[in-house]
Curated annotation (Swiss-Prot):
Belongs to the DEFL family. It is found in: Secreted. It comes from the Eukaryota. Residues 1-24 form the signal peptide. This is Defensin-like protein 286. Keywords: Antimicrobial, Disulfide bond, Fungicide, Plant defense, Secreted, Signal. It comes from Arabidopsis thaliana. The keyword RNA-binding does not apply. One of its GO terms (biological process) is defense response to fungus. Disulfide bonds join 41-63, 47-68, 53-70. The keyword Cell membrane does not apply. GO terms for cellular component: extracellular region. The lineage of its organism: Eukaryota, Viridiplantae, Streptophyta, Embryophyta, Tracheophyta.
Amino acid sequence: MNNFRITIVAFLAVLVFTTTVTNSLDEPNMDTISKSREYKCKIDLDCSNHIACRHCSYRNCKCDHGTCKCMP
C-alpha cells in the first residue's frame, strides 16, 4: 500500500511539473523594463484580437513595423 501512495505522489509531481513547463514555454517574451508582454505582429491579421485594436474597427487595425495600430 505504501508503494501505491509513492507512485501516486510521483505521478502528480511529474504532471504538475510538465504542466508548469509547458505553460511557461507558451507565454510571450516579457519586457524587463515595463514588465509588459512584448507582442510583435507580422501581418494585419495578427492584430485582429490584440488589445491595441479593441477601440478601432477590424479593417482599420494594421501591423505597422511589428506594432498593431489603428489607421485612419
